């Protein structure tokens, strides 16, 4: 009974699933506090560092994983203070080149530098400028590749130059000076460094460079990264620049973009979706009712990617929009609910269940995402996570329709924060135990259940144990995990975790290393606060400007360089 807990709404639950790795995989969401995700990762690390590391890779994986940004980067930075150079180098290289983005290295350096400057006890601990070396080595490799190309075809290079900091950007201001450190590592003068970046970015056709130099005719919308395309669509869709000045260049850009959207609607061209998550598209329509062809095409591409991985048969989704799900988690629940409804075949296609004291089926009408989001917005919502009534609804529907056992719902997705209402006044029977009992009594097999966590709750409770058959627990905002469920051979929390992690390969250097204690720094309250501040400050794109007073100090990433103290920089 020591593991017995309760949800925020009183339902029977557990303090832990019985596996620290599952707890980390399921509990940690974008709303998690630093104390939560560092300590939860530490427990997973102590249980099995190899599985914990694979979960961290999946958490960052922008292609087939959860695609989270700041949490995995913060954990990777934290690990740097505990691992020797060889071990850290082996994992950070894979972290960036296989699963993340070159910008991750900039964030790691920033968090590390600010933490060192504010925390004397770690100022000289495990100094290892591997991030600078990775940038320098890759830039040199790409520069050589471009210069040595004598053929007529364009050679492929990495995106390192896109993210490498320029001299006058945020990441080269004190106390960071990352561009200066990279340039010094490469043995280049400032002018040589600038010319190298210009050449590589021109080769990559980096959007920001094409826009700033008015080379609009070179923009290929079908090849633009999804996030860049979404951010810049308003700029593409007007005849003027940001100052309202009209020009022939901007008119031509607008015309080209309009033609691209027309081709998209006819299926004559493509759109990238890597990096865009379903809720970001649904969010466009929750804040605006204007039709957007780019949003529609990106949604269709995501839906096709899920459908091409397999087919959901007799599947339906329960969408939690209770009060605790306000904001982003609610957007995700709506988006993933619509996606499941569209990707399932059979009688439950296009249908979802909404949480309410008296939940109901809701049929999604409309021919496009805009209309389906409006349909969901008009659905009857309630502020209750009454899962017991959902099971009653599904069962009564089957009894009334005289469904045969094989016609019953096969899998039930619950997009939620897992804080279900109390099922039994005595607290002895959980919602799921109730559902299993009622279905069995009626002669039906209880559906497989996917508990998809979208918010880190205050109670930190979990509804299931690691080996509970017929159930899985997931978390995150990405649709990529839907594909894993389609292809899973076993259906319990532990088996599903291992199935999700199958693609992730660890470096032998890391595998063969001993498990070291990674809790020593965060155990100190002052250190914890300083690390949290460093992480929070790294979220600002242009966080600091120079004040009138400057003092000389040592840059932790470049000890020989004189810089100003962090205290002499203030928030913009």
Swiss-Prot record:
Q: Which domain of life is it from?
A: Viruses
Q: Which Gene3D superfamilies match?
A: von Willebrand factor, type A domain
One Pfam family hit: DUF2828
Q: Where is this region: Disordered?
A: 543-572
Low complexity bias locations: 547-563
Alphabetized InterPro entries for the sequence: DUF7788 (IPR056690), UCP015417_vWA (IPR011205), vWFA_dom_sf (IPR036465)
Protein name according to UniProt:
Uncharacterized protein L728
Q: Which organism is it from?
A: Acanthamoeba polyphaga mimivirus
